[in-house]
Structure formats: structure tokens, C-alpha cells
Curated annotation (Swiss-Prot):
The lineage of its organism: Bacteria, Pseudomonadati, Pseudomonadota, Alphaproteobacteria, Sphingomonadales. It is found in: Cell inner membrane. This is Putative membrane protein insertion efficiency factor. Keywords: Cell inner membrane, Cell membrane, Membrane. One of its GO terms (cellular component) is plasma membrane. It holds the Pfam family YidD. Its main location: membrane. Belongs to the UPF0161 family. The keyword Cell membrane applies. SMART domains: Haemolytic (SM01234).
Length: 70
């Protein structure tokens, strides 16, 4: 249930502010898509933690390129 709510929030981001703002994600798939896959695959707690770690890595001095969900 919590995972679905978090997925809904990520989806709202994709359909709302993300379409207006310039793309800034350094990774593929995008951070929001990565979060959705992580939440579906691992659930709210573990998937949320995986998504949070990805968001913390997404900055100008972080990595880049293809980064699949474990």
C-alpha cells in the first residue's frame, strides 16, 4: 500500500514538474523511473532505500550512464 503511494508520487512528478523543468538526471533510466521500478521490485522499505540512495548519487560530481535497479 505504501509502495503504491510512493509510486503514485513518482508518477505525478513525471507527469507534472518533470515535463516543465529541463532534464537534469545524469543516469538512465531517469531517477523517477528507477524509483518506480525499485518500489515495484523490492517494496516500500527496501525499494525506497534503493531509490533514496540513487537520488543522493544524482548530482554534478556523481556518476552517470546506465544504472539498472539491482
Amino acid at each position: 500500500m505504501i509502495a503504491r503511494l510512493l509510486i503514485l508520487i513518482a508518477r505525478a512528478w513525471q507527469l507534472g514538474p518533470s515535463r516543465v523543468l529541463p532534464p537534469t538526471c545524469r543516469y538512465a533510466p531517469s531517477c523517477s523511473e528507477y524509483a518506480i521500478v525499485a518500489l515495484r521490485r523490492h517494496g516500500a522499505i527496501k525499494g525506497g532505500w534503493i531509490a533514496t540512495k540513487r537520488l543522493l548519487r544524482c548530482h554534478p560530481w556523481g556518476g552517470h550512464g546506465y544504472d539498472p535497479v539491482p
